[in-house]
Amino acid sequence: MKARKSQRKAGSKPNLIQSKLQVNNGSKSNKIVKCDKCEMSYSSTSIEDRAIHEKYHTLQLHGRKWSPNWGSIVYTERNHSRTVHLSRSTGTITPLNSSPLKKSSPSITHQEEKIVYVRPDKSNGEVRAMTEIMTLVNNELNAPHDENVIWNSTTEEKGKAFVYIRNDRAVGIIIIENLYGGNGKTSSRGRWMVYDSRRLVQNVYPDFKIGISRIWVCRTARKLGIATKLIDVARENIVYGEVIPRYQVAWSQPTDSGGKLASKYNGIMHKSGKLLLPVYI
């Protein structure tokens, strides 16, 4: 998801990470290539560029390595026949109706999966790992690097970060922002956006409780329902003892792919025939 203040135009290509190219005193030209899988452009004659590409390529396609000790578990799945959720309010484990993964896919059979909440008060590697992932996400979306204050503050809870872990790799993330005002009431940041024109409806300020600041899934794990599962688990764990309804979730000016997800998740059809998306600014 794009940050709410970003000026990125819809459909624009993301800025790709690239180091300073080595000219080698002009005696050797640099051959710029573009990876067809991660879409990064880099110099094939630069050792530094190749190293940066290898790291970026792995993160984009397969996510980041994640220690089993990082994060507080809020959702676990041990196999594809049973999905469970750990309730923070009751401490009990209850089955969920559906798995986010396709049982027919042989490449994901018998994989341990979980969703964790990133604890900002921890000085270990989980905060650094999350920050590294967000650098990748923001570069891909060409978005400002200003969302970390939402989830990593130890003095004021402005929101939370959740990470989807598969076989000790972070393959998806979501940053949720609280839209409550200082008096506990919802703020006036909510808007309706017309899906096809991306135009905001004027003089209408709906109440939304939480906003999706960022949502991202690595390339090899997309179209498996992971993004939807992240939103569902976040709704159940962002506010202690409360499940936020779908209609009170807003999006931070969604990208093209984010808009498609939003339209399916909680878009509403206006009497005019226009599809409206809940957004916030």
Swiss-Prot record:
<dbReference type="GO" id="GO:0003682">
    <property type="term" value="F:chromatin binding"/>
</dbReference>
<dbReference type="GO" id="GO:0032200">
    <property type="term" value="P:telomere organization"/>
</dbReference>
<dbReference type="GO" id="GO:0061733">
    <property type="term" value="F:protein-lysine-acetyltransferase activity"/>
</dbReference>
<dbReference type="InterPro" id="IPR016181">
    <property type="entry name" value="Acyl_CoA_acyltransferase"/>
</dbReference>
<dbReference type="Pfam" id="PF13880">
    <property type="entry name" value="Acetyltransf_13"/>
</dbReference>
<keyword id="KW-0863">Zinc-finger</keyword>
<keyword id="KW-0539">Nucleus</keyword>
<comment type="similarity">
    <text>Belongs to the acetyltransferase family. ECO subfamily.</text>
</comment>
<keyword id="KW-0808">Transferase</keyword>
<dbReference type="GO" id="GO:0006260">
    <property type="term" value="P:DNA replication"/>
</dbReference>
<dbReference type="GO" id="GO:0006281">
    <property type="term" value="P:DNA repair"/>
</dbReference>
<comment type="function">
    <text>Required for establishment of sister chromatid cohesion during S phase but not for its further maintenance during G2 or M phases or for loading the cohesin complex onto DNA. Interacts with the three known alternate replication factor C (RFC) complexes, suggesting that these complexes have essential but redundant activity in cohesion establishment. Acts by acetylating the cohesin complex component SMC3. In vitro, possesses acetyltransferase activity where it can acetylate itself and components of the cohesin complex (MCD1, IRR1 and PDS5), but is unable to acetylate histones.</text>
</comment>
<protein>
    <recommendedName>
        <fullName>N-acetyltransferase ECO1</fullName>
        <ecNumber>2.3.1.-</ecNumber>
    </recommendedName>
</protein>
<dbReference type="GO" id="GO:0007064">
    <property type="term" value="P:mitotic sister chromatid cohesion"/>
</dbReference>
<dbReference type="GO" id="GO:0005737">
    <property type="term" value="C:cytoplasm"/>
</dbReference>
<dbReference type="GO" id="GO:0070058">
    <property type="term" value="P:tRNA gene clustering"/>
</dbReference>
<keyword id="KW-0235">DNA replication</keyword>
<keyword id="KW-0131">Cell cycle</keyword>
<dbReference type="GO" id="GO:0007088">
    <property type="term" value="P:regulation of mitotic nuclear division"/>
</dbReference>
<dbReference type="GO" id="GO:0051276">
    <property type="term" value="P:chromosome organization"/>
</dbReference>
<dbReference type="GO" id="GO:0000785">
    <property type="term" value="C:chromatin"/>
</dbReference>
<feature type="modified residue" description="N6-acetyllysine; by autocatalysis">
    <location>
        <position position="223"/>
    </location>
</feature>
<dbReference type="GO" id="GO:0008270">
    <property type="term" value="F:zinc ion binding"/>
</dbReference>
<dbReference type="GO" id="GO:0034089">
    <property type="term" value="P:establishment of meiotic sister chromatid cohesion"/>
</dbReference>
<dbReference type="GO" id="GO:0005634">
    <property type="term" value="C:nucleus"/>
</dbReference>
<keyword id="KW-0479">Metal-binding</keyword>
<dbReference type="InterPro" id="IPR028005">
    <property type="entry name" value="AcTrfase_ESCO_Znf_dom"/>
</dbReference>
<keyword id="KW-0862">Zinc</keyword>
<dbReference type="GO" id="GO:0006302">
    <property type="term" value="P:double-strand break repair"/>
</dbReference>
<feature type="region of interest" description="Disordered">
    <location>
        <begin position="86"/>
        <end position="105"/>
    </location>
</feature>
<dbReference type="GO" id="GO:0007076">
    <property type="term" value="P:mitotic chromosome condensation"/>
</dbReference>
<dbReference type="Pfam" id="PF13878">
    <property type="entry name" value="zf-C2H2_3"/>
</dbReference>
<dbReference type="InterPro" id="IPR028009">
    <property type="entry name" value="ESCO_Acetyltransf_dom"/>
</dbReference>
<comment type="subunit">
    <text>Binds specifically to CHL12, RFC1, RFC2, RFC3, RFC4, RFC5 and RAD24 when members of an RFC complex. Interacts with CHL1 and MPS3.</text>
</comment>
<feature type="zinc finger region" description="CCHH-type">
    <location>
        <begin position="33"/>
        <end position="57"/>
    </location>
</feature>
<dbReference type="GO" id="GO:0016407">
    <property type="term" value="F:acetyltransferase activity"/>
</dbReference>
<keyword id="KW-0012">Acyltransferase</keyword>
<dbReference type="GO" id="GO:0140588">
    <property type="term" value="P:chromatin looping"/>
</dbReference>
<dbReference type="GO" id="GO:0043596">
    <property type="term" value="C:nuclear replication fork"/>
</dbReference>
<dbReference type="GO" id="GO:0034087">
    <property type="term" value="P:establishment of mitotic sister chromatid cohesion"/>
</dbReference>
<feature type="compositionally biased region" description="Low complexity">
    <location>
        <begin position="95"/>
        <end position="105"/>
    </location>
</feature>
<keyword id="KW-0007">Acetylation</keyword>
